[in-house]
């Protein structure tokens, strides 16, 4: 009996040691992946406070002093506040359009339960597989013929391109919402809009935040569609376009890295801050949509 007990304790200790070693290896791998992911961002931050000579001599070193001189110069070079306002307007109204249209569309498809609604949902999800590059030239031609090469036209196009993914996320959530809640609201005298915004919408906060953040990050950082639609229009360029059109290109003595790094840094700060504060909602929204779908 004593021998069997000792053998059992040895097996438990052996399993515990293997588990501990496995956890250590897992943590090392995760730390390396985190370092690999954060390294470009840290380099961007450090080099935003360096002179051009410091960057060229040792781009991975800490700055000699954390001065905002180069950030201020970069803000002037890309006309930061004006382009920030334009980017905010485009992002805000594009996301608002996406949320309203995709929420209503996904809700209608889940409640109709017909072959047509199923086919429409299939078309929307299949549209996510179409690469944007295959639509560029027809899009530019259509925008020119319909006089949509403007900020409102850009907002409408973002609504069209982002609606497929948004419907996909909302559709999975709506399938798990009991229709009895909506029927009860209708019996209490609510019209379809009151029922949707006062009963259904409050139930999908996490999914809505997920749709907002995913689309806001994409629209905020997008360069190609604004370049094709509005180009270098005076007073209506977004931050990403300003990074290209501003005087940050190769000059007689090379690239002005002391302006390029801080310009990119201040451009991505707003969307990073939004993501940090809303990441919990994003994860919950994706999980809810997957489980209920």
Regions found by a protein language model. Name each.
Residues 1-17:
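Short, Lys/Arg-rich, polar N-terminal cytosolic tail immediately upstream
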């Amino acid at each position: 009996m004593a021998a069997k007990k000792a053998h059992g304790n040895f097996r438990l200790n052996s399993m515990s040691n293997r588990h501990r070693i496995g956890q250590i290896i897992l943590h090392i791998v995760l730390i390396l992946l985190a370092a690999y992911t954060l390294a470009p961002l840290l380099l961007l931050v450090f080099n935003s406070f360096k002179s051009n000579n410091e960057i060229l001599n040792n781009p991975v070193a800490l700055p000699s002093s954390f001065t905002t001189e180069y950030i201020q110069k970069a803000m002037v070079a890309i006309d930061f506040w004006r382009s920030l306002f334009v980017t905010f307007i485009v992002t805000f109204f594009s996301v608002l359009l996406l949320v309203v249209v995709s929420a209503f569309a996904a809700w209608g498809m889940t409640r109709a339960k017909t072959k047509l609604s199923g086919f429409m949902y299939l078309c929307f999800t299949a549209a996510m597989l179409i690469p944007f590059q295959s639509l560029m030239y027809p899009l530019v031609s259509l925008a020119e013929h319909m006089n949509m090469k403007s900020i409102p036209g850009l907002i409408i196009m973002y609504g069209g391109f982002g609606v497929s993914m948004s419907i996909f996320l909302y559709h999975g959530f709506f399938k798990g919402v009991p229709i009895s809640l909506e029927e009860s609201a209708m019996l209490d005298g609510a019209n379809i809009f009151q029922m949707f915004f006062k009963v259904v919408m409050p139930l999908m906060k996490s999914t809505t935040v997920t749709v907002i953040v995913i689309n806001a990050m994409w629209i905020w950082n997008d360069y190609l569609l604004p370049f094709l639609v509005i180009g270098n229009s005076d007073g209506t360029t977004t931050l990403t376009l300003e990074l290209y059109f501003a005087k940050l290109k190769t000059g007689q003595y090379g690239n002005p890295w002391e302006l390029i790094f801080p310009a990119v840094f201040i451009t991505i700060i707003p969307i990073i801050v939004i993501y940090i504060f809303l990441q919990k909602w994003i994860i919950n929204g994706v999980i809810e949509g997957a489980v209920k779908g």
